[in-house]
Amino acid sequence: MVRRFALPAAVILALAAGAPGPLSARTSVTVQEALLRAKPAVVLVIAEVSAEVTLDCGGGPTTVTPPVFRETGTGWFVDGRGWIITNGHVVQPAHTPPRWLVNQQAQRAVTTACLAKVLQRQGITPGERPDVEDAVKRRLLDAVLPTTKVKLNPQVSVVISSGARFKAEVKKYSPPVSNEPGVMSGRDLALLLIPGAEFPVLPLADSKVGRIGDPIHILGFPGVVLSHELLNKSASVEASVTNGAVSGFKQDVTNQPVIQTDAPAAWGNSGGPAVDQKGAVLGVLTFVSLAPGPEGSIVQGFNFVIPSDAVREFVKDTEVKIEGKSKFTEAWFRGLREFFTEDWKAAARHFEAADKLVPNLPDVKRILGDARENIKNPPPRPFPWFWVAVWVTLLSGAGYGGQFGLRWHRNRYRIQPSEVIRMLEAGKAPIVLDVRRTEVYEALPLKIPNSVRLAPEELASGVSGLELDTNRPVVAYCT
């Protein structure tokens, strides 16, 4: 009996293990869900430095405002109360403006205010005589720059994916890694704070448990997308995603650990989160690899990430709470969970709550629309092969069980020939009743010694006067 039912039972257990039930749905996260968890918490970081340059081109002091210096990078909410992590080098031009930036703004001002006037006096149109123009420009810079005064107005801003822009305050700063003598080298992290009390947030993963080959996804705002002439303005507020794997564990020039990945990255991705397969931050993109030569193009496949454990260490003496929780995130994660288990109504309720907390996030709007559409027009459900397999297995098991029960009922008093032999060997010879049908008994020469002949007809009509030793077992031979 055990052998007969072993196969159906095993099949049922295997099918049940693969069944789409509440427990399995709650413990697994698809790549799509993981990335949607992360995207709303990723922000564009802008470091801007405007300048007021006072100079004298020969006609008295004048104030010039050269074009604003601007660099962009990526950041992400580590605390839903407005705390953002990015790279130190992303905000460095605005946080600690370097000397070269002061000189650059001064030179731009001199070129803008003075060069055209001098060329005009010499009867030269700008661009007409490049060689003469370059010589005049060099003389002007030598003459005007020493008395030029530059006032810088640095500012760091953050743009969330709804397009809302916030002025950010740098609350903690660690300079970028450097191998130049005399240049301070740090962890290349910066902690920003923007006004507001409710934002998306990303949880931190444990970077120590990462292994080579683990999937990794980099989110950010690469400049090639921000400046793409064929994309509209929405590209500047929605994070792009690249995918790869952990490809190594290295140390930078100051012996600090970094994670190597082959996930593609570009200028503008700096400071962006590198998330794992559950959407938690495994690290922060910090630097890429450049080809040798003056152009120094990026060599993809060799990018590096600051481990999340370094982020924990960086913010431990601040007001940041590393909980990975906010009201928005709770509603957003629940909505995604319900959406991917096809509970469209519950998903829509959570998405609506998330949209009220942080309005107009593109991913929220998009998936809320999908949930509402699925409520109105439910998508076709796949054929329930799982339950068909379960029922077929159960019916097969019932059939096997019925056959076994019938056979057991018929044979419940049957004794095997080996049992008879054991009785004979043990000196407990049974009384053998030969109850074969008459035609079989007469046709076959086999006769059992010392047996008692009893035809089936006699059994049917009732037997009287049959004397048997009641202390001996009785075996009926019918085949």
Where are the model-predicted features located?
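C-terminal subregion of chymotrypsin/trypsin-like serine protease catalytic domains
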Residues: 88, 92, 99, 105-107, ...
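Flexible, polar/low-complexity N-terminal or interdomain linker segments that lie immediately upstream
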Residues: 380-443
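Short, aromatic-rich amphipathic segments at membrane interfaces
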Residues: 362-386
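Catalytic nucleophile loop of clan PA
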Residues: 76-77, 211-212, 264-285
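Conserved catalytic-core segment of clan PA serine endopeptidases
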Residues: 33, 101-197
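Flexible, gly/ser-rich surface segments that form the specificity/activation loops bordering the active-site cleft
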Residues: 70, 158-185, 201-259, 266, ...
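Catalytic cysteine-centered active loop of the rhodanese-like fold, especially the PTP/DSP P-loop
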Residues: 463-479
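N-terminal activation segment of mature serine protease catalytic domains
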Residues: 23-83, 87, 95, 186-190
